[in-house]
């Protein structure tokens, strides 16, 4: 190696090291700025889901319901395994492997964001990152600031809560459209029966709704919902 090539190599290495240091310092600064704004993960262990006021007849038939959100909490142990599988294969197939942030998926989303001139075409959020958003923890403006907050809180939640606790929160809080929040409420909204009584096709239909709960639910967008259901079933087949 000539003296000139050694100098070029040394310069490149110095620039790379300087860039790495700048990135580390920037991330540290972002963390110090945002961390005080992040709630404690323990908060989500005791979260109370908003449920509407329900009026029943003497023989316990529902006759009226008041409230903006329809929520029917369900324990993870009572959720059909096929629905859990459909949801994970569709929304976050590495849920039980990552520590709150799926770096690979996040990197692909960032690349897509750049290639598509700022248009979001692929979601990079894990189920853990989506829980605070579904519970209204952060405002929906300032996309990049919110994303950093979601990442920091997801890492905290994964350290202090179990995977099953996080998944149960998600299943009970994710929006399904038509005022239905949570899988049990969605089952009654679209099929008039509990989650445990649904067929595989119906469970797959519900699992595909969270990506577009308003435009992609079976009532507002039946064709889109069917296409999404078929995609969920294909992914379940591929994952085995």
Question: What do the predicted segments below correspond to?
Answer:
Residues 63-65, 96, 214-217:
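Short small-residue beta-strand/loop micro-motif enriched in glycine and branched aliphatics
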Residues 1-56, 94, 114, 239:
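N-terminal type II signal-anchor transmembrane helix
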Residues 7-11, 15, 81-82, 146-150:
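Residue-level signature of transmembrane alpha-helical entry/exit and packing/kink sites
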Residues 34-86:
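Terminal hydrophobic membrane-targeting helix
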Residues 119-240:
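Non-catalytic, structured segments within soluble enzyme domains
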């Amino acid at each position: 190696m000539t003296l000139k090539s050694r100098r070029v190599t040394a310069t490149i290495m110095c620039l790379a090291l300087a860039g790495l240091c700048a990135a580390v310092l920037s991330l540290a600064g972002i963390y110090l700025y945002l961390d005080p704004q992040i709630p404690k993960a323990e908060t989500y262990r005791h979260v109370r889901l908003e449920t509407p006021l329900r009026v029943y007849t003497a023989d316990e038939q529902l006759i009226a319901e008041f409230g903006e959100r329809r929520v029917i909490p369900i324990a993870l142990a009572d959720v059909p395994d096929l629905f859990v599988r459909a949801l994970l294969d569709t929304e976050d197939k590495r849920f039980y492997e990552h520590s709150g942030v799926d770096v690979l998926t996040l990197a692909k989303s960032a690349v897509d964001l750049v290639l598509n001139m700022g248009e979001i075409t692929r979601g990079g959020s894990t189920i853990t990152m989506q829980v605070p958003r579904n519970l209204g923890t952060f405002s929906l403006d300032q996309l990049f600031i919110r994303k950093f907050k979601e990442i920091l809180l997801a890492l905290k939640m994964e350290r202090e809560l179990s995977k099953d606790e996080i998944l149960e929160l998600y299943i009970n809080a994710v929006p399904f459209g038509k005022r239905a929040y949570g899988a049990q409420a969605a089952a009654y909204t679209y099929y008039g029966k509990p989650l445990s009584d649904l067929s595989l096709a119906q469970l797959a239909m519900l699992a595909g709704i969270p990506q577009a709960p308003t435009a992609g639910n079976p009532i507002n967008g039946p064709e889109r919902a069917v296409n999404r259901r078929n995609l969920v079933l294909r992914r379940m087949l591929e994952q085995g």
